Curated annotation (Swiss-Prot):
The keyword Coiled coil does not apply. Forms a beta-barrel structure that accommodates hydrophobic ligands in its interior. GO terms for cellular component: cytosol; nucleus; protein-containing complex. Belongs to the calycin superfamily. Fatty-acid binding protein (FABP) family. It comes from Bos taurus. Cytosolic CRABPs may regulate the access of retinoic acid to the nuclear retinoic acid receptors. The lineage of its organism: Eukaryota, Metazoa, Chordata, Craniata, Vertebrata. PANTHER family: FATTY ACID BINDING PROTEIN. This is Cellular retinoic acid-binding protein 1. Pfam families: Lipocalin (PF00061).
Length: 137
């Protein structure tokens, strides 16, 4: 069982602005979001398949609690409520599909993977993928 637990700081980010654009976020809000999310702090607690993930930025803090294999409610990157279903894609990677509770929008998902002491987080909106790499603090 991989150990995702710990505090993580972002080392690199690719395509975050493009992801927000694909989600329909306007230019001014994208600029604010990109600046605010440039140094997120992530805390993960794990007990087997049970996860608690807290992500803090200068403008927003999100917290999710879930068990791999069980659906839960959260918000997409742009703040829309969704039903999410996390599953183990492989022994070190969780893949989570998201279904909007209301309205239409791109097909979204996230993954979290441990590789070489790094946490690789991806967000997807249709065919646009944002990759963020974190290292332990």
């Amino acid at each position: 069982m991989p150990n995702f637990a710990g505090t993580w700081k972002m080392r690199s980010s690719e395509n975050f602005d493009e992801l927000l654009k694909a989600l329909g976020v306007n230019a001014m809000l994208r600029k604010v979001a990109v600046a605010a999310a440039s140094k997120p702090h992530v805390e993960i607690r794990q007990d087997g398949d049970q996860f608690y993930i807290k992500t803090s930025t200068t403008v927003r803090t999100t917290e999710i609690n879930f068990k791999v294999g069980e659906g839960f409610e959260e918000e997409t990157v742009d703040g829309r409520k969704c039903r999410s279903l996390p599953t183990w894609e492989n022994e070190n990677k969780i893949h989570c599909t998201q279904t909007l509770l209301e309205g239409d929008g791109p097909k979204t998902y996230w993954t979290r993977e441990l590789a070489n002491d790094e946490l690789i987080l991806t967000f997807g909106a249709d065919d646009v993928v944002c990759t963020r790499i974190y290292v332990r603090e």
